[in-house]
Amino acid sequence: MPITLDPEKLAIVMKHRFQYKICRECGARNPPNAEKCRRCHSKNLRPKKFKKK
């Protein structure tokens, strides 16, 4: 994927790649508005980390 994307496409990519939550216990991906994990029903969720280069 090219690095030089237009801002609209970059916003779409960032939304789909980084707007979800990760369960700290089982590692499952959950929707951004989740309060409990879909797999293990834990409430220990964190937002997906974004690493800048």
Curated annotation (Swiss-Prot):
Family: Belongs to the eukaryotic ribosomal protein eL40 family.
GO molecular function: structural constituent of ribosome
Gene from which the chain derives: rpl40e
Name of the protein: Large ribosomal subunit protein eL40
GO BP: translation
Organism ancestry: Archaea, Thermoproteota, Thermoprotei, Thermoproteales, Thermoproteaceae
GO CC field: ribonucleoprotein complex; ribosome
One Pfam family per UniProt: Ribosomal_L40e
UniProt keyword annotations, A-Z: Ribonucleoprotein, Ribosomal protein
InterPro entries reported in the protein's UniProt record: Ribosomal_eL40_arc, Ribosomal_eL40_dom, Ribosomal_eL40_sf, Ribosomal_zn-bd
Residues making up the signal peptide according to the UniProt record: none
